[in-house]
């Protein structure tokens, strides 16, 4: 089965086919944070979904090149810097650093590129794109000295959000970065400098100012990935106006279809309500860590529901994530220890266990059906535990089972922080198991003490030796 993904543009689930003639390389752009504050868990729902998508595509043999932008100049960042009495670059750097720390805590893979909008090469590209649109008559400079995109020049505007422009009757201009579709109008490509911007300004042929939010992403995406992308992701709140504007300005500049597959993550609620500071249910990752939860527990909770469905994020859900991860940890520990048993028996894994592994990936092939995938994983855990209880698995088979788990975990990134058993300690454990099989208790005790010298404790259980650091 090929990977199938729901395309917001067509509103259909489609076979994923990359632009690469060899069918291997995938160009993926994901809208990153606006670094005016700490990212909240609603943001991280989108970022964990995008991480799951990348990991699954890679598990299926694709080579993903991903770009995630950092919006470090816009209305919000400028207001924040001004309120804090700091230079824009100093103000945003704090939140850039915090964002990368949060990514690592949630085990989200780093993108190949993290372009920041204020980097000179991207500012230059934004100015060049705006200049091209002006030359084509698609953009114009208004009396407020700002440059706007003329919606009438792009009849396909609204197709992504499935808007009927005849009903909305767009008129006038919109200078703010974010607005509702009822206020639709020509959007700003370049905002003329005013006193509120302070030192935030760049020189352009049409006057000093700064780029609008939408042109930033078009410039960075096409600079790093070219004029055509395989996948563009974001939250549903990005569909309009941001992604709609990206399509218009990018395709007018390049003459090519900007994105083949658009994927959008649904909203996150907290305890059944819209997240807000006034309701007391606004969480950053740091807030949850202070409550005693771990990054992987938050990651699990964020991935429990398919990305296209609203997620009700709750403290009870986090506690459920902790319990589920505990069950996974116990199982992984059991099969990890059982492989140290002494046995000459080998054999392939029972078919039902291999089928569960295949079922996990097949579920994710179906538009990242995470519920189906997790169902397959927990069936694998239940059935393999039962087989171990009844003596139906050999150490060699559990070693193969562990490999299946490792391939699953490369996608989920759920495993407990790894405690790597040094090779010399593992060798001592195997020697001790052989000594016990030979009933050489003196050698067994000596090897146990030698293992302890290396900083490890070995306990004998019905499933074999269990190792833990001292």
Where are these regions (language model features)?
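N-terminal, positively charged, Ser/Thr/Ala/Gly-biased leader segments
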Residues: 104-114, 120-137
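Short, solvent-exposed turn/loop segments enriched in Gly/Ser/Thr/Pro and often Arg
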Residues: 67-74, 117-120, 237
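Structural preference for alpha-helix termini/caps and helix-kink/transition segments
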Residues: 281-470
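Short, well-structured beta-strand/strand-turn elements
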Residues: 63-65, 137-143, 457-459
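N-terminal, positively charged nucleic-acid-binding surface of large information/translation enzymes
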Residues: 10-13, 18-109, 467
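Alpha-helical recognition segments enriched in aromatics with Gly/Pro capping
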Residues: 1-36, 47, 51, 124-336
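The substrate-binding groove and active-site-proximal loops of carbohydrate-active enzymes
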Residues: 81-88, 114-119, 235
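Alpha-helix C-terminal capping/helix-coil junction sites
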Residues: 58, 104, 134-135, 263, ...
């Amino acid at each position: 089965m090929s990977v199938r993904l729901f395309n917001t543009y067509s509103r259909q689930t489609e076979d994923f086919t990359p632009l690469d003639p060899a069918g291997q390389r995938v160009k993926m752009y994901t809208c990153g944070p606006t670094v005016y504050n700490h990212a909240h868990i609603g943001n991280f729902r989108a970022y964990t979904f995008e991480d799951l998508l990348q990991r699954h595509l890679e598990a299926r043999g694709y080579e993903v090149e991903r770009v995630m932008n950092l919006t470090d100049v816009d209305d919000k960042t400028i207001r924040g810097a001004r309120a804090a009495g700091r230079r824009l670059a100093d103000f945003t750097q704090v939140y850039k650093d915090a964002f990368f720390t949060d990514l690592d805590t949630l085990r989200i893979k780093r993108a190949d590129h993290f372009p920041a909008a204020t980097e000179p090469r991207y500012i230059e590209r934004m100015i060049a794109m705006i200049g091209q649109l002006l030359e084509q008559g698609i953009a114009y400079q208004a009396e407020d000295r700002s440059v706007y995109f003329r919606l009438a020049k792009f009849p396909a505007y609204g197709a992504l959000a499935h808007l009927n422009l005849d009903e909305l009757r767009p008129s006038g201009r919109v200078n703010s970065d974010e607005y509702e579709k009822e206020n639709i109008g020509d959007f700003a490509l370049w905002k003329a400098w005013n006193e509120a911007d302070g030192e935030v300004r760049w020189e352009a042929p049409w006057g000093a100012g700064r780029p609008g939010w939408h042109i930033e992403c078009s410039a960075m995406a096409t600079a790093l990935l070219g004029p055509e992308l395989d996948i563009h992701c974001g939250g549903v709140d990005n569909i309009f106006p941001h992604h709609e504007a990206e399509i218009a300005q990018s395709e007018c500049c390049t003459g090519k279809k900007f994105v083949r597959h658009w994927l959008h993550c649904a909203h996150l609620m907290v305890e059944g309500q819209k997240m807000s500071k006034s309701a007391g249910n606004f969480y950053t990752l740091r807030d949850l860590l202070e409550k005693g939860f771990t990054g992987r527990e938050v990651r699990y909770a964020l991935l429990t529901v398919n990305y296209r469905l609203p997620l009700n994020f709750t403290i009870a859900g986090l506690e459920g994530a902790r319990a589920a991860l505990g069950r996974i940890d116990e199982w992984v520990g059991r099969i990890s220890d059982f492989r140290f048993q002494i046995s000459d028996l080998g054999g392939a894994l029972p078919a039902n266990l291999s089928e569960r592994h295949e079922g996990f990936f097949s579920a994710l092939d179906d538009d990242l059906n995470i519920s189906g995938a997790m169902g397959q994983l927990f069936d694998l855990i239940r059935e393999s535990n039962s087989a171990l209880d009844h003596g139906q698995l050999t150490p060699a088979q559990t070693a193969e089972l562990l490999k299946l788990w490792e391939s699953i975990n490369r996608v989920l990134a759920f495993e407990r922080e790894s405690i790597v058993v040094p090779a010399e300690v593992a060798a001592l454990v195997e020697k001790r198991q052989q000594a016990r099989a030979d009933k050489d208790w003196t050698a067994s005790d000596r090897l146990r003490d030698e293992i302890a010298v290396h900083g490890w404790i070995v306990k004998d259980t019905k499933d074999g030796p269990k190792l833990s650091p001292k």
